[in-house]
């Protein structure tokens, strides 16, 4: 039996998918722009 692949970790999740991580790259900023355009209430995982 293999182990479960999803091992939740809040810090790693925020470091990878958080607001500052999105702002750090051009593509990340594009993600934020499209989520804003769509009207998402939560832009990133750090907006709890």
UniProtKB/Swiss-Prot annotation:
<dbReference type="InterPro" id="IPR020939">
    <property type="entry name" value="Ribosomal_bL34_CS"/>
</dbReference>
<dbReference type="GO" id="GO:0006412">
    <property type="term" value="P:translation"/>
</dbReference>
<dbReference type="GO" id="GO:1990904">
    <property type="term" value="C:ribonucleoprotein complex"/>
</dbReference>
<comment type="similarity">
    <text>Belongs to the bacterial ribosomal protein bL34 family.</text>
</comment>
<dbReference type="InterPro" id="IPR000271">
    <property type="entry name" value="Ribosomal_bL34"/>
</dbReference>
<keyword id="KW-0689">Ribosomal protein</keyword>
<protein>
    <recommendedName>
        <fullName>Large ribosomal subunit protein bL34</fullName>
    </recommendedName>
</protein>
<dbReference type="GO" id="GO:0005840">
    <property type="term" value="C:ribosome"/>
</dbReference>
<keyword id="KW-0687">Ribonucleoprotein</keyword>
<dbReference type="GO" id="GO:0003735">
    <property type="term" value="F:structural constituent of ribosome"/>
</dbReference>
<dbReference type="Pfam" id="PF00468">
    <property type="entry name" value="Ribosomal_L34"/>
</dbReference>
């Amino acid at each position: 039996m293999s182990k479960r692949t999803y091992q939740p970790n809040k810090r790693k999740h925020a470091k990878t998918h958080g607001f500052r991580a999105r702002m750090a790259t051009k593509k990340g900023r594009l993600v934020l722009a499209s989520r804003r355009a769509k009207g998402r209430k939560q832009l990133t995982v750090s907006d709890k």
